[in-house]
Amino acid sequence: ATSNYIVKFNDNLNILNFHENIYKNKIVYKKNLFIPKSILNNFNNSIIFQNNDFIVINKWAQIATQGGSKINISIDHIIKNISPNYRLVHRLDKETSGLLIIAKNLNNAKLFSNLFQQKNITKLYLALCEGNPKLHQSQVSLDITNKKLKLDNTLTNYKVLNTKNGISQIMFNPKTGKTHQIRIVSKNLGSPIIGDNKYN
């Protein structure tokens, strides 16, 4: 076709070498964001379950779940390049690895959100922490200051699974979902998470 040809309904378009040139090494995202092939491979390799409704990945550490002013690439960026219908159901901190649910459409995202709100999904986190809490199993009620400088009441169950050489493996079961809840609770226990530069 010539450069001044106007595309009409039912026209067939053929873009030469489209997949080879566009998708061989990267995928284009809105605002000119490019997702390197290596990161796409990481995402595909992280999938541990998938059906027609949702995906479960084992999110690797050091990638953000959502974008932000200082975030170049996030899981949200990646899934939006795969399909604009994909939706995050919950989030994990950038430094945290673990299971992350991705709904394949808005309706399924709402279903999962309701399951989380109704406490029908149990969240369990494992962390290596410094020291050894006085109580090896307990429930912590703690007020945490949020971004609006208001107090949020949090509730967290924890259990020490193993201790060795001044390090404890602790399982946390947060009953509320506040920002940095587990990190703040572990610090309050006197056993901050190893490698947590913000709360250690």
Segments the model singles out, each with a brief description of its role:
Residues 1-200:
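RNA pseudouridine synthases
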